[in-house]
């Protein structure tokens, strides 16, 4: 069977009406009457199987396994009159890629056209379009039909024939994503459009209100093309569902896997995307493993990008640096992974509950991993054992949402000794009941100048320092450095005695920072 490619533009508002409209508007010839020039309509049925050529991949990139075909599920199939170009009927393939479409015809030659649109239910559609907003289509060769005929026409969309098989991989990957979301939320996501074409050099990203844009092998990607990068596709799908089902405050921008100082809004957003590709694959491995394109033995938590020189990382087995703190996207992904499975093994349902039902309610503070932590506590009211477990999951990535070794230190009496000069103490700004305050005592000598300073700020910390005199009331110095996250106060002791360094989260912290965080306090003599 010969095939050819078309990119078509059409009104998507008549997907299921064409058959009815054509049957109603084309006049039928009545028996014994003068039919004049009206065409005689006959019925026939076309059945078949639609499949596309996929690519198997693993940690080292594409494996080269061929031929490797998969059913093209839920895609739009049109029966087109060869002579007039009219679409006689439409339907969709099922989960096996099979279709069966009855139609009326008056001329004897038609062809089957497969369009780059998947229709899962009503308005829950997925489209892949070119940057000029045209749908892709693959057509069979023309064939003759006769009244009452049932004709089989299979369509195999193969790379070797120069067909846009990658377009239909994009459709199928996102169809799996839609099914994943429905299993969690009870409904498919709203319509999604992905934009891809050969040579697109504008990057891969999700744009709210528009869709997902994918590299096509040129420009900034250095030849990278993403139509078969399933993990990259699902990463962007994670941004899409965050926009449609949750809340995403990310400012966007450049991000690197080893960057431990990202804007917390960005690290959360990208970490959710990194986690999403693993979560979808994990769900598929349990529910429909035939939809996966990974080679045997590849973990669901392995993220693969087949750009030029393929790279991958396994975020489930990471240990130590450099992937740590709330400001690192991989640390966020691993934390979510170990909540869903692994260490925590709570399943995806509570993760989705916080994502869908709590995060959209957050106001006054940005959505980041702090907000997700707060949501877990709010949605689950965990007992002590669960709280300790999730604290361990977070602290494995040095995300310290728990009491530090110096607590309780919210008051002027602390169990541990006063801090010594030049000694560094690491503190966590965290209190589940409200804003945390660390009060650190030290012994000062009258007439001596000192510098109290915070440094090594992690997890989005932004500190504000006050130094209080021995009467515990008089403030002898304060600093809320509005241009830097760290703070420092220089002062001279007016008398011998115990002075107190009070550290809180800055009230003027930028949106990139957090309410919590980790810092190191040191007092030095000037």
Model-identified regions with their sequence ranges:
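Short, ordered, surface-exposed loop/turn motifs in non-cytosolic proteins
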Residues: 53-84, 189, 460-463
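Zn2+-dependent metallopeptidase catalytic core
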Residues: 100-104, 151, 155-193
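Bacterial Sec-dependent N-terminal signal peptides
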Residues: 23-48
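Non-catalytic, beta-strand-enriched accessory regions in extracellular/secretory proteins
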Residues: 421-450, 464-466, 484-490, 500, ...
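Short, acidic Ser/Thr/Gly-rich low-complexity loop/linker segments typical of extracellular
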Residues: 81-98
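Short pre-active-site segment immediately N-terminal to the catalytic Zn-binding motif
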Residues: 214-233
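C-terminal edge strands of extracellular/lumenal beta-sandwich accessory domains
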Residues: 401-419, 438-441, 458-459, 466-472, ...
């Amino acid at each position: 069977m010969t095939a050819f490619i078309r990119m078509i533009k059409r009104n998507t508002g008549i997907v299921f009406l064409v058959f009815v409209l054509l049957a109603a508007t084309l006049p039928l010839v009545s028996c014994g009457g003068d039919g004049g020039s009206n065409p005689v309509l006959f019925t026939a049925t076309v059945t078949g199987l639609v499949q596309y050529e996929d690519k198997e991949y693993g940690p080292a990139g594409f494996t080269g396994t061929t031929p490797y075909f998969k059913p093209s599920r839920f895609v739009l199939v049109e029966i087109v009159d060869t002579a007039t170009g009219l679409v006689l009927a439409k339907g969709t393939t099922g989960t096996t890629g099979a279709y069966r479409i009855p139609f009326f015809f008056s001329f004897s030659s038609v062809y089957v056209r497969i369009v780059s649109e998947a229709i899962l239910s009503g308005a829950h559609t997925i489209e892949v379009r070119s940057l000029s907003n045209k749908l892709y289509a693959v057509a069979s060769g023309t064939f003759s039909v006769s009244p009452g005929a049932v004709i089989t026409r299979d369509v195999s969309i193969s790379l070797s024939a120069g067909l846009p098989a990658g377009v239909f991989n994009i459709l199928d990957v996102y169809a799996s994503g839609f099914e994943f979301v429905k299993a969690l939320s009870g409904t498919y996501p709203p319509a999604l459009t992905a934009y891809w074409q050969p040579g697109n050099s504008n990057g891969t990203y999700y744009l709210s209100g528009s869709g997902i844009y994918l590299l096509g092998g040129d420009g900034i990607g250095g030849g990278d093309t993403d139509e078969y990068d399933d993990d990259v596709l699902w990463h962007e799908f994670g941004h899409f569902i965050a926009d449609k089902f949750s809340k995403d405050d990310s400012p966007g921008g450049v991000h690197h896997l080893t960057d431990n100082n990202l804007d917390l809004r960005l690290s959360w957003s990208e970490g959710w995307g990194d986690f999403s590709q693993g979560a979808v694959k994990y769900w598929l491995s349990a529910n429909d493993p035939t939809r996966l394109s990974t080679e045997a033995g590849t973990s669901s938590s392995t993220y693969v990008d087949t750009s030029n020189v393929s790279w991958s990382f396994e975020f489930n087995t990471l240990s130590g640096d450099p992937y740590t703190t709330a400001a690192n996207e991989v640390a966020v992904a691993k934390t979510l992974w170990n909540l869903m499975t692994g260490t925590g093994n709570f399943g995806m349902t509570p993760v989705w509950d916080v994502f869908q039902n709590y995060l959209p309610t957050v106001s006054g503070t940005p959505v980041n991993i702090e907000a997700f932590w707060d949501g877990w506590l709010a949605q689950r009211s965990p007992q002590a054992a669960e709280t300790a477990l999730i604290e361990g999951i977070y602290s494995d990535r040095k995300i310290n949402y728990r009491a530090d070794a110096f607590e309780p230190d919210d008051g002027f009496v602390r169990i541990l000794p006063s801090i010594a000069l030049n000694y560094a103490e690491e503190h966590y700004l965290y209190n589940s009941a409200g804003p945390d305050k660390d009060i650190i005592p030290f012994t000062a000598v009258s007439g001596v100048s000192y510098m109290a300073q915070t440094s090594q700020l992690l997890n989005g910390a932004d500190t504000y320092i006050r130094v209080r005199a021995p009467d515990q009331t008089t403030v002898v110095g304060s600093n809320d450095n509005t241009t830097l996250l760290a703070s420092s106060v220089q002062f001279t002791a007016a008398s011998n005695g115990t002075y107190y360094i009070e550290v809180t989260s800055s009230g003027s912290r930028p949106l990139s920072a957090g309410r919590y965080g980790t810092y190191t306090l040191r007092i030095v003599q000037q």
